[in-house]
Amino acid sequence: MQVLSGADRFGAQAGEPPHWVEHLSVPDLSVGTYSLPAGSVDTQDPHTEDEIYVVLRGRGALATDDATADVGPGSVVFVPAGETHHFVRIVEDLTVLVLFAPAEGARASTTGM
């Protein structure tokens, strides 16, 4: 067993760029915190792994090619591998717990990331 503590304390502050902090990585899973200040632009590329986002704090929306959904504390969103997605309309500093399966980078990239 490994207990992770403090993941909810990581967060980008106003004026800082979005950032990623990895907390755990094993072959089949990785977990980290992705933080985006209010008004920032999310420039991430699609990943080769399935993702689950759990919003810890803040408000915004997650947009894919097919839909846009408002998210806030407690929102849980599944994004399948390869799907284009970005956080948009970030109106409050946003911190999300991100789970990748398998671990981020475990699959070969097909998008030139």
Where are these regions (language model features)?
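Structural motif
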Residues: 52, 59-61, 68, 84, ...
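Short strand-coil-strand connectors
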Residues: 27, 63-67, 90
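Short acidic-glycine-tyrosine-enriched beta hairpin
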Residues: 66-81
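Ligand-binding loop in jelly-roll beta-barrel domains
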Residues: 81-106
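Short, conserved beta-strand element in jelly-roll/cupin
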Residues: 36, 46-62
